[in-house]
């Protein structure tokens, strides 16, 4: 069984932690946002790399897109096509990337849990400020609903990492 599985979600839902858990369980799992050269922060108006981007500055956050290089992602995927392979991340051009995957899992948590995670996480500085968090929350429901309409399978990410990973593995192996 060869399957490419995407695990995505809004900032703070636990994508990286779930990816790490899947790797601990012996699966191939890639945090694609952490791979050098695969993503670029671009200015929405120019499409060029954003020179002075700042995760804490709401105006700059609103002007930027986090874009994945589809061709580079395809090369990574072609080198890792044996068995069940997990990729985690999100991108402004996610709709363009979705057809590359056999299944898409959307990690979801409540706004309360999300606020707590964003405020206390140390692995990533995106949405640390209350101002940027408010902006993230304003987009959360619409973005999640959009992905579900595109075929993403919603996963309750407020559970333990082991429960989440086990659920994703089980559903990844099923034909539905």
Feature locations, PLM:
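Glycine-rich phosphate-binding loop used to anchor ATP phosphates in small-molecule kinases
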Residues: 60-100, 108
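ATP-binding Walker
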Residues: 13
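The Walker A (P-loop) glycine that initiates the GxxxxGKT/S ATP-binding motif of P-loop NTPases
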Residues: 9
